[in-house]
Structures are given as structure tokens and as C-alpha cells.
């Protein structure tokens, strides 16, 4: 495999995982065209590459990871959200694998997500009562966040887009919404990789034989390093009052790209 392609795929993963766009879809499209992978194989490869993003999150949020077992509220949040993510996400992952084998078009859910992001940006821009902190979340609200994250198992649906938007709509301030959405990603992504190993081992064997361990390792490292930069950048923006601009921009991009995808297909 061309090492430049490995680096490019890693960069795509490292950027798209933390933006409110579907990293699975971006990796699916890129690996499909750059490596001529079958769509379902490309989807498996995208999930396999999440190891790089997991590494980014573990490094960036290492202090939060250390305090999980000393902070009962944070532990409860991660347990509840991860449990609901698994309950909702695992069946949807199995369904997704079938959908991708039957010409499923991920542009459709991306359009709805783009519209949701634009609406969320409008809400953030004109709301004057967004003062709640993460520690004020109720158990029911944690369940909603877990369900939202589980739905992101579907191709075309962004995990960070779903969780961040849900937390913002619940009134959580943008800085906390982005921060704890990214933290909740860690156990969910580990579970996602585990599910991939369990249900699509034959796909993974094919990907390894086609791309090679060195190519995969390079892509994972590239995703990890890119992710560290992107996480830091987005969290800095989330501290400002301009976070709604991210929603407007990415929502518009998601809608335009998805409509272009529908026209081409």
C-alpha cells in the first residue's frame, strides 16, 4: 500500500472524528475510492482505524481518565452513556453491515444531521440561558445522550455531532458539551472496535492482508497525531461565543456534500 495513502486516510480520520460530521462516512468514501475497497470492507476499515482516535482521546484527556474512579458523577455519566450506546448501537451496527451490502446511501442521514447542526447553531446563537454545567445533568438526560451516541452506529450519522448537539439542546454550555462528548467517545470507541472484531473478523483479515500491518500502523499514528491537534483546536473554539459558527459551517457542508452525493448516485 502507498504510505502517502495511509497518511491521508489517517488525517481524514483524525479530523473527521472530532467534527460534527460522520468520520465513518468520510473514511468509507476515501478508502473506497483510494483503495477500491468494497463498501462494507471500507466501513470495517474505518472502524478499525478508530484505534488512532482512541489514542488521541486517551492522551488528551488523560487527567479525566485518571479521575474517573474518584469522581462518582463522572463515572455514572460514562457508565450510563456507554451502556445505552451499546444497547442501541450494537443492533444498529449489525443492521449497518447489511445495509452497506445493499447499496445503502449514507448521504440521506447526513442531510438530516446537517439540518440539525444548522438548527442547533441558530439555537446557540440566539439563546440567552445556556448556563448549565455538565454536573447538572440528570440520569434521564444521560440516557438521552447515550441513545444519541448509539444512533451514530449508522453510516452517515456523526457521533460527536449527535452527542454535542444533544448536550447543547439540553442547555449544557458549549465547552462542557464538547469536552465530555469527547470523553464519552473513549469507552464507546473501544466497544465499537470490539464489536468490529466480533462480527467482521473475516473483513479485518482481508483488510490486513490487503493493506499490510505497516500501512495500517502508519494510518493509525497519523490519525492519533492529527486528532490531538484537532481536539485542542475545537475545545479552544468551544470556550468562545463563536461555537455556533462551527455548526453553521459544518451543517452547510454536510447538506451540500450529501445532496451532491445523492445527485451523483
Swiss-Prot record:
<keyword id="KW-0812">Transmembrane</keyword>
<feature type="transmembrane region" description="Helical">
    <location>
        <begin position="137"/>
        <end position="157"/>
    </location>
</feature>
<dbReference type="Pfam" id="PF02673">
    <property type="entry name" value="BacA"/>
</dbReference>
<keyword id="KW-1003">Cell membrane</keyword>
<feature type="transmembrane region" description="Helical">
    <location>
        <begin position="180"/>
        <end position="200"/>
    </location>
</feature>
<feature type="transmembrane region" description="Helical">
    <location>
        <begin position="104"/>
        <end position="124"/>
    </location>
</feature>
<dbReference type="InterPro" id="IPR003824">
    <property type="entry name" value="UppP"/>
</dbReference>
<dbReference type="GO" id="GO:0050380">
    <property type="term" value="F:undecaprenyl-diphosphatase activity"/>
</dbReference>
<comment type="similarity">
    <text>Belongs to the UppP family.</text>
</comment>
<protein>
    <recommendedName>
        <fullName>Undecaprenyl-diphosphatase</fullName>
        <ecNumber>3.6.1.27</ecNumber>
    </recommendedName>
</protein>
<keyword id="KW-1133">Transmembrane helix</keyword>
<keyword id="KW-0378">Hydrolase</keyword>
<feature type="transmembrane region" description="Helical">
    <location>
        <begin position="41"/>
        <end position="61"/>
    </location>
</feature>
<feature type="transmembrane region" description="Helical">
    <location>
        <begin position="244"/>
        <end position="264"/>
    </location>
</feature>
<keyword id="KW-0472">Membrane</keyword>
<feature type="transmembrane region" description="Helical">
    <location>
        <begin position="75"/>
        <end position="95"/>
    </location>
</feature>
<dbReference type="GO" id="GO:0005886">
    <property type="term" value="C:plasma membrane"/>
</dbReference>
<comment type="function">
    <text>Catalyzes the dephosphorylation of undecaprenyl diphosphate (UPP).</text>
</comment>
<feature type="transmembrane region" description="Helical">
    <location>
        <begin position="215"/>
        <end position="235"/>
    </location>
</feature>
